[in-house]
């Protein structure tokens, strides 16, 4: 049985390739910012409007920690994007329910879990260094949608594993 080709697959392939490059560029930019900010802390504190009366040291340490945790997201994002790319390739070949895709989904779920944990830590650091004089609003912390995505991908990994086993059983009986 032949299946109609989807226009979404080539688009997904190109978008994932672009996102992989952008992810590494993001990592390079954050690394450059960390190096620059720590090389010129007085200029950096002025650039982000830290009031003159505040001790810049805890803010600098906190922001450096946040950026460093942001750098940890780069390889996690890379893992997610490359696994998705391989899955798109298997769908394009008409062979998505294979054990490799179940393993890929499981790896994606673990990476998403790690990203959620990073977000919690980043949110906590942001709240710790924020003050009335230096309000810091980060899009980090607890996310119901993020945690639901983690659960969903773990479940999908199991569905793919079962689908691959059922397919192998079916091929063995035909």
Predicted regions and their residues:
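Alpha-helical transmembrane segments of multi-pass integral membrane proteins
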Residues: 115-174
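Interfacial loop at the N-terminal end of multi-pass membrane proteins
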Residues: 2-11, 25-66
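Hydrophobic alpha-helical transmembrane segments of multi-pass integral membrane proteins
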Residues: 20-31, 72-76, 80, 109-121, ...
């Amino acid at each position: 049985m032949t299946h109609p080709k989807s226009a979404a697959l080539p688009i997904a392939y190109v978008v994932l390739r672009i996102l992989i490059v952008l992810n590494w560029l993001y990592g390079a930019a954050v690394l450059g910012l960390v190096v620059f900010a720590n090389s010129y802390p007085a200029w950096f504190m002025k650039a982000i409007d830290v009031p003159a009366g505040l001790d810049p040291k805890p803010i600098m340490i906190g922001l450096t920690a946040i950026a460093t945790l942001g750098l940890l997201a780069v390889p996690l994002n890379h893992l997610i994007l490359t696994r998705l790319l391989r899955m798109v390739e298997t769908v394009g070949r008409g062979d998505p329910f294979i054990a490799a895709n179940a393993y890929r989904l499981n790896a994606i779920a673990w990476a998403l879990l790690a990203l959620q944990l990073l977000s919690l830590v980043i949110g906590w650091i942001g709240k710790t260094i924020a003050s009335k004089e230096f309000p810091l609003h980060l899009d980090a912390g607890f996310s119901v949608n993020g945690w639901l995505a983690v659960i969903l991908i773990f479940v999908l990994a199991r569905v793919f594993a079962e689908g691959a086993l059922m397919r192998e059983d079916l091929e063995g009986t035909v």
